[in-house]
């Protein structure tokens, strides 16, 4: 039975209001000139100033007479013991830009750019970043000695080098922030506590992008683009995870230097272009390869690696706020930023049912040791790309897009959590009983339940090669343009189409995909009519 006071407090209502305001000012000055019908010059200078402000306020009320009176004004009172909460953030940025573009006879091209940016997101003495770029190009197909090659429509060589900056993090990462307790007063002073650590040395992440490329068009059907790049990043912006004892979950710091290099190849072919038969088919594909290497780390990052060694393979998960046996992110010079660190495993010992490990020095042991972790894989794929086609025939159209990745590895945490580290008080995977070691001499995929290393720490046994193929989109349609009733002039255009994304996925690794984006499959039908 409820008391009168409890009865009139039934039901709660939470209301949140938020808004974001962006103000920008841009002033630009352009100059262009053409002379002797061969020289083309364009120059530009620009100044910009901007501010982005966001704020949100949340409050709760309670006490509703019935579920029909569900607007907040029908509440009896604010939530007992509750008070309004919210957040706000402000970021400001200004920049100065100057650029020059020059072309001679549509054959030789030159680009130069300089940009100075200042952002309030960085430390007080590190707010300005200076970036420049230079590029050259040569349209070989416009040379006189190439005019006899009628099958060649475009042949262009290009090269560029320059710097870009990144500030991809939230406001107030460079300064200390506090929360005040308006209801806690001592000696007429309200209480407060430190919410985040200051980092006055936080500065722009800079990437030097060196690129050479080729553009080719031949036979009026085939287009090819090739790029080779080397990207050197300094002052690498990285969120550093802290142990719970620090009082903060993470902070942002410039932690070192890294290098990415690789190539990108894109091709498209107009395979069929028959207007008489109203048949058109375009095919496209791309291939990308990238390698990543850490060139330098600072002392803070090195200390963070040491602290993870002391965690004995149990890491702090930022999302669940709990300990996890997922391989921790570690940074080591000469290694990839996406390297998978684990202890090498020789599998399950048929005689004992325990996992047999290989130490860093090559000795056999049944004991998992954090000091024996080495790089056992890399999440970065060796090759990635897309392909697909666009077909149109007498009003029918089919457009498809596929994504593929070849090579690289992943740590199959699903097997770890659902089989070896499962909670026996709940429903479990059948492999907990069918796949584990039970009797001497048995060859098993999973260790025995009474293994002294109860929790399975990062081990190469769960590092698996990952290749996959996804059909990312399918669009089927019919345009009624050729139908007789369209000739009456009442309807100008009528088209029916069906769209589906994430059609299927084939993978060499079986694991839980979850329900979060980007794995939300959607279907849509559309009817377009123009009268």
Residue ranges and their predicted role:
Residues 1-3, 7-320, 458-531:
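Extracellular/periplasmic, surface-exposed regions of secreted and cell-surface proteins
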Residues 2-12, 69-89, 182-195, 311-376, ...:
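Flexible glycine-rich, low-complexity coil/linker segments exposed to the extracellular/periplasmic environment
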Residues 119, 350, 405-494, 500:
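Extracytoplasmic gating/loop element in the C-terminal half of outer-membrane beta-barrel translocons
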Residues 401-403:
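Transmembrane alpha-helix/helix-exit interface in multi-pass inner-membrane proteins
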Residues 256-381, 405-408, 414:
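Gram-negative outer-membrane beta-barrel transporters
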Residues 385:
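Extra-cytoplasmic beta-strand recognition segments
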């Amino acid at each position: 039975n409820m008391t009168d006071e409890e009865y009139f407090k039934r039901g709660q209502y939470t209301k949140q209001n938020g808004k974001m305001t962006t103000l920008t000012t841009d002033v630009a000055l352009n100059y262009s000139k053409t002379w002797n019908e061969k020289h083309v010059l364009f120059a530009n200078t620009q100044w910009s100033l901007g501010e982005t402000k966001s704020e949100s306020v949340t409050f709760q009320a309670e006490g509703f007479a019935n579920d029909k009176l569900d607007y907040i004004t029908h509440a009896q009172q604010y939530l007992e013991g509750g008070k309004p909460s919210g957040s706000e953030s402000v970021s400001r940025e200004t920049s100065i830009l100057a650029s020059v573009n020059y072309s001679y006879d549509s054959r030789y091209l030159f680009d130069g750019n300089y940009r100075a940016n200042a952002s309030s997101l960085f430390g007080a003495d590190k707010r300005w970043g200076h970036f420049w770029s230079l590029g050259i190009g040569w349209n070989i197909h416009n040379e006189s000695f190439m005019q006899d090659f009628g099958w060649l429509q475009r042949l262009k060589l290009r090269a560029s080098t320059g710097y870009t900056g990144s500030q991809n993090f939230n406001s107030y990462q460079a300064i200390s922030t506090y929360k005040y307790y308006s209801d806690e007063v001592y000696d007429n002073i309200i209480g407060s506590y430190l919410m985040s650590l200051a980092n006055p040395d936080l500065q722009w992440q800079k990437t030097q992008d060196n690129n050479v490329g080729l553009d080719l068009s031949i036979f009026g059907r085939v287009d090819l683009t090739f790029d080779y790049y080397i990207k050197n990043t300094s002052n690498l912006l990285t969120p550093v995870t802290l142990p719970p004892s620090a009082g903060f979950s993470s902070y942002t710091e410039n932690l070192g230097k890294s290098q990415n290099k690789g190539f990108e190849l894109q091709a498209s072919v107009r395979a069929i272009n028959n207007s008489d038969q109203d048949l058109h088919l375009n095919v496209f594909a791309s291939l990308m390869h990238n390698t990543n290497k850490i060139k330098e780390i600072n002392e803070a990052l090195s200390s963070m690696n040491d602290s993870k060694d002391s965690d004995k393979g149990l890491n702090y998960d930022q999302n669940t706020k709990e300990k996890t046996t997922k391989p921790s992110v570690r940074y080591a010079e000469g290694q990839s930023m996406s390297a998978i660190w684990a202890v090498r495993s020789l599998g399950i010992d048929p005689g004992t049912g325990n996992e047999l490990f290989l130490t860093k020095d090559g000795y056999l042991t049944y004991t998992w040791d954090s000091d024996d972790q080495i790089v056992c894989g890399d999440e970065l794929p060796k090759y990635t790309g897309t392909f697909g086609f666009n077909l149109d025939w007498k009003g029918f159209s089919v457009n498809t897009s596929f994504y593929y990745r070849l090579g690289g590895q992943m740590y199959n945490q699903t097997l770890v959590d659902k089989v070896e580290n499962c909670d026996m008080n709940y429903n479990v995977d059948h492999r907990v009983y069918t796949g584990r070691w039970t009797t001497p001499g048995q060859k098993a995929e999973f260790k025995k339940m009474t293994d002294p290393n109860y929790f399975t720490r990062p081990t190469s046994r769960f590092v698996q090669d990952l290749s996959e193929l996804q059909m990312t989109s399918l669009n089927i349609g019919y345009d009624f343009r050729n139908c007789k009733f369209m000739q009456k002039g009442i309807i100008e255009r009528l088209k029916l189409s069906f769209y589906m994304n994430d059609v299927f996925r084939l993978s060499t690794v079986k694991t839980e995909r979850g329900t979060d984006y980007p794995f939300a499959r959607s279907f849509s039908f559309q009817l377009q009519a123009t009268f």
